[in-house]
């Protein structure tokens, strides 16, 4: 059996944030959610999160994950003290305990699997994850004997000059035989500079300690401040871009674009500079996004272009052109072959196939049929100060420039609205609707007496 414990009790003082450190966002998910996801493929029998600082907030954020046990560490007195809180929780448990850190979010699933499998194959009491760092300053050094066993872990400040030349470091991630660990946990001492209980000290107490070296040291980067958060974001973003480039997506300027891990792309998608995708985006084949666009929880069909525009929680069909400077807001549903042009905003509306809203319009709480042509400056006046009302426009209708449709109102099929009209009443199929003051021209106005 396998139990996973994630250490998530720390304050994260150096983040200088009201948000607990483990809830800081990284490419669309919190740090601790990424850590939990990295171990999901192991299908652990128990998953425990050791919480402390703002425990209620952490539990509330993660409650939806399910099958997650929360263990309170109060006060927070070191990593060894955190794992001691599992003694009553895992009473009678037989198997391995995998200990992960809630602020180390770049671990790959295959690295964790390698650690657990290596531990099981070696029959060790503990197997720790190690990394060779170009600059190991500040890290504890791991020393290994000829048989591959860990002979010692020496903190940086205690290393001799010769020992400092060793760049094999302790990543602080462990796989234990739980029964062996449970015997030594009560023996931990606070006899150290910080007066805390260190989980690292258990390694020297256990008869057989082994290690597995991580291939990519970036995987064990911890996060203690905003700079390190940004560095990890950069690493993760590069991973995501590399993955999708291998799947047939073109990034014109990769470093200027950001993705969420929940994005999915078809083939031959081109992403122009300064384009950002957040949340769960689904992008079809042959789309061109950007430059300078933001998509969030958006679903696009194939052959869609988005130029200098924002698409949030909207659905877009095939062959649609969006922008420049358009804004599709939540619940906008744009059918195949539409054109959503310059400075157009669409909110909570359905736009039928082949319809065009080319310039300077607001379409809100509306339903447009197929092949509707919305003239420049057409506005659906949907709000009466208390409630929102719907506008319905039938197939093949067209509105002239600078028209106002005051909802609730329905225009039938093949209706024409004269330019500059304010329409307040329903219009039947095939009709011409004009709602504007009669033009009055007064001759000689410029020459009138002062």
UniProtKB/Swiss-Prot annotation:
Residues binding acetyl-CoA, per UniProt: 376, 382-383, 419, 436
Q: Segment Linker: which positions?
A: 227-247
What EC number(s) would the UniProt record show? 2.7.7.23, 2.3.1.157
Q: Where is the active site?
A: 359 (proton acceptor)
The alphabetized UniProt keywords are: Acyltransferase, Cell shape, Cell wall biogenesis/degradation, Cytoplasm, Magnesium, Metal-binding, Multifunctional enzyme, Nucleotidyltransferase, Peptidoglycan synthesis, Repeat, Transferase
Broad class of where this protein is predominantly found: cytoplasm
The function of this protein is:
Catalyzes the last two sequential reactions in the de novo biosynthetic pathway for UDP-N-acetylglucosamine (UDP-GlcNAc). The C-terminal domain catalyzes the transfer of acetyl group from acetyl coenzyme A to glucosamine-1-phosphate (GlcN-1-P) to produce N-acetylglucosamine-1-phosphate (GlcNAc-1-P), which is converted into UDP-GlcNAc by the transfer of uridine 5-monophosphate (from uridine 5-triphosphate), a reaction catalyzed by the N-terminal domain.
Record note on quaternary structure:
Homotrimer.
This one is known as Bifunctional protein GlmU
């Amino acid at each position: 059996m396998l139990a996973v414990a994630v250490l998530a009790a720390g304050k994260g003082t150096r983040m200088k944030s009201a948000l607990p450190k483990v809830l800081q966002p990284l490419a669309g998910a919190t740090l601790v959610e990424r850590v939990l996801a990295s171990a999901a493929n192991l299908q652990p029998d128990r998953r425990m999160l050791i919480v402390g600082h703002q425990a209620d907030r952490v539990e509330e954020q993660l409650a939806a994950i399910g099958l997650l046990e929360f263990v309170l560490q109060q006060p927070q007195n070191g990593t060894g003290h955190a794992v001691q809180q599992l003694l009553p929780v895992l009473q009678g448990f037989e198997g391995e305990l995998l200990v992960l850190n809630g602020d180390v979010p770049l671990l790959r699933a295959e690295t964790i699997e390698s650690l657990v499998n290596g531990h099981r194959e070696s029959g060790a009491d503990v197997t720790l994850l190690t990394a060779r760092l170009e600059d190991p300053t500040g890290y504890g050094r791991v020393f290994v004997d000829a048989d591959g066993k860990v002979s010692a872990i020496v903190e940086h400040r205690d290393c001799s000059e010769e020992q400092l030349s060793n760049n094999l470091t302790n990543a602080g991630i462990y796989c234990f035989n739980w029964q062996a660990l449970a015997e030594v946990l009560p023996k931990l001492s606070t006899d150290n500079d910080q007066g805390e209980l260190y989980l690292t000290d258990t390694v020297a107490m256990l008869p057989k300690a082994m290690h597995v070296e991580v291939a990519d040291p970036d995987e064990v980067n911890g996060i203690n401040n905003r700079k390190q958060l940004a560095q990890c974001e950069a690493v993760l973003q590069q991973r995501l871009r590399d993955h999708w480039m291998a799947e047939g997506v073109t990034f014109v300027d990769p470093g200027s674009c950001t993705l969420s891990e929940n994005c999915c792309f078809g083939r031959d998608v081109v992403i122009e500079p300064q384009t950002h995708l957040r949340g769960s985006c689904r992008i079809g084949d042959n789309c061109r996004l950007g430059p300078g666009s933001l998509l969030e929880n958006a679903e696009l069909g194939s052959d869609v272009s988005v130029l200098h525009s924002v698409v949030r929680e909207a659905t877009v069909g095939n062959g649609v052109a969006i922008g420049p400077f358009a804004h599709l807001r939540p619940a906008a549903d744009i059918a195949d072959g539409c054109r959503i042009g310059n400075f157009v905003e669409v909110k909570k509306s359905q736009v039928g196939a082949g319809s065009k809203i080319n310039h300077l319009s607001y379409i809100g709480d509306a339903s447009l049929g197929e092949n509707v042509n919305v003239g420049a400056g057409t506005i659906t006046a949907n709000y009466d100060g208390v409630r929102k009302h719907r506008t319905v426009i039938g197939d093949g209708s067209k509105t002239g420039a600078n028209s106002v449709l005051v909802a609730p109102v329905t225009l039938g099929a093949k209706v024409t609205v004269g330019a500059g009209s304010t329409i307040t009443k329903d219009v039947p199929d095939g009709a011409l609707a004009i709602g504007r003051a009669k033009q009055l021209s007064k001759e000689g106005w410029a020459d009138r007496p002062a």
